[in-house]
Amino acid sequence: MSEQKRTPIFTEYASHGAKTIDFGGWDLPVQFSSIKHEHEVTRTKAGLFDVSHMGEISVKGPKSESFLQYVLTNDISKLEPGKAQYTIMCYEDGGTVDDLIVYKLDDEDYLLVVNAANTEKDANWIKQKNTYSNDEIVIEDVSNQYVQLAIQGPKAVEILQKCTDENVQEIKFFRFKNNVALKGIEAKALISRTGYTGEDGFEIYIDASSGVALWKLLLEKGEANGLEPIGLGARDTLRFEANLALYGQELSKDISPIEAGLGFAVKVNKGPDFIGKEVLKNQVENGTDRKLVGIEMIDKGIPRHEYEVLKDNKEIGFITSGTQSPTLNKNVGLALINISYTEIGTEVDVKVRKRILKAKIVPTPFYKRGR
């Protein structure tokens, strides 16, 4: 069995009481205090996440834009340096390779941030699809060069501002600043107004050698604002409430972005052809047989990943993610089900272990900031 991978921040976990687990081959903190507490801290104050396990793939060269237009579903011709974009890679049959964020660093320089468990698969897939020469495009997995930390929550702006003379408030949503100087830290950082919690906040990319120093700086400057380190457990409940897809659950090689409600990131009418376009265009124009919906339990029980959803004793789909929502204090889930049963208010059943429990279709997201 291969040894578990660890991020450069691993050495800091124990002093904060972290309980670690194996997450896709990585030794990562599932929680520091409790999932519910960490969830609440992020929603009301601010949370600090070590997300250095995420993958980074560099795509550079004069043909990088035209190549990325071919492998990504969104339209990156809309990007200018300093802008980021949520996008997806699909197979020819419309299934999902991965969802990711692309950063345009310069006209011929892009950084793709992909899901940790998919990094090697994604890098190989991208290289396999490339038909350009090395003079035209260079693709490199640069994951080991970066530490990625996320600071999320209503106090995130105030805390990060204490760490730099750069005005972070003026970084708009899905925009970023590169080469930002941080107080007392050697390496410069890329600071992006993005996140995976449904809260305001930033994702910060810095050279791996300065990662621990950045972690300590943020916790020190954020102490007065109630900043705490947050584990994977709360990261999952936060993203779930905000209806942010998780690869392997809401998206997979068998689930298209259109089925998952991510059509906003699939530009079927952009000029260049892209992988999966034909199938995805058909799904956009003619609809899909399945759709991702919200489910709220009527009977007592928690809907978990892969539990069956039934109507009149017939299977109509399955739960992709589910939990007791810390914000709503309700048992809710996301489910991919037959399009005929997706109207809000429709009653369905969920098979929780051997019990058949009542539930109903409800709107998503379960949580929206400021609402």
UniProtKB/Swiss-Prot annotation:
One Gene Ontology biological process: glycine decarboxylation via glycine cleavage system
Keyword flag Transferase: yes
Keyword Metal-binding: no
GO CC, alphabetical: cytosol; glycine cleavage complex
Entries under Pfam families matching the protein: GCV_T, GCV_T_C
Any GO MF annotation of the entry: transaminase activity
Gene3D superfamilies: Aminomethyltransferase beta-barrel domains, Aminomethyltransferase fragment, Probable tRNA modification gtpase trme, domain 1
Catalytic activities: N(6)-[(R)-S(8)-aminomethyldihydrolipoyl]-L-lysyl-[protein] + (6S)-5,6,7,8-tetrahydrofolate = N(6)-[(R)-dihydrolipoyl]-L-lysyl-[protein] + (6R)-5,10-methylene-5,6,7,8-tetrahydrofolate + NH4(+)
Subunit structure: The glycine cleavage system is composed of four proteins: P, T, L and H.
Family matches, as PANTHER family: AMINOMETHYLTRANSFERASE, AMINOMETHYLTRANSFERASE, MITOCHONDRIAL
Function, as annotated: The glycine cleavage system catalyzes the degradation of glycine.
Recorded family membership: Belongs to the GcvT family.
Name this protein carries in UniProt: Aminomethyltransferase
Organism: Oceanobacillus iheyensis (strain DSM 14371 / CIP 107618 / JCM 11309 / KCTC 3954 / HTE831)
